[in-house]
Amino acid sequence: MGSITASFILITMQILFFCEDSSGEPNFAERNFWHASCSARGVYIDGSMITTLFFYASLLGVCVALISLAYHACFRLFTRSVLRSTW
């Protein structure tokens, strides 16, 4: 757990303090995370409509899969406890 926290802090520090401007030079004057030079490379925040639909469809699929796995696990535990109980 400690190595995950250390890695997270290291990555956050790199994002916040080593942003580059358009010329490729480190921009220490603007250490604002929301500055355009600090945005992720190759990942657009405002995507097209198809990208948005694909994202939400994927998110819905993951949610349905997690809910079905949780339901299956609870149903299996309930069935096992009912079969072991004596009436």
UniProtKB/Swiss-Prot annotation:
Q: State any GO CC term.
A: host cell membrane
Q: Which Pfam families match?
A: Herpes_UL49_5 (PF05702)
Q: Signal sequence: where? A: 1-24
Q: Which keywords fit this entry according to its UniProt record?
A: Disulfide bond, Host Golgi apparatus, Host membrane, Membrane, Signal, Transmembrane, Transmembrane helix, Viral envelope protein, Virion
- How does the protein associate with the membrane? Single-pass type I membrane protein
Q: What is its main location?
A: virion
Q: Which domain of life is it from?
A: Viruses
Q: Could you list the residue ranges that cross the membrane?
A: 49-69
What does the record note on quaternary structure?
A: Interacts (via N-terminus) with gM (via N-terminus). The gM-gN heterodimer forms the gCII complex.
Q: Which family does it belong to?
A: Belongs to the herpesviridae glycoprotein N family.
Protein name per its UniProtKB record: Envelope glycoprotein N
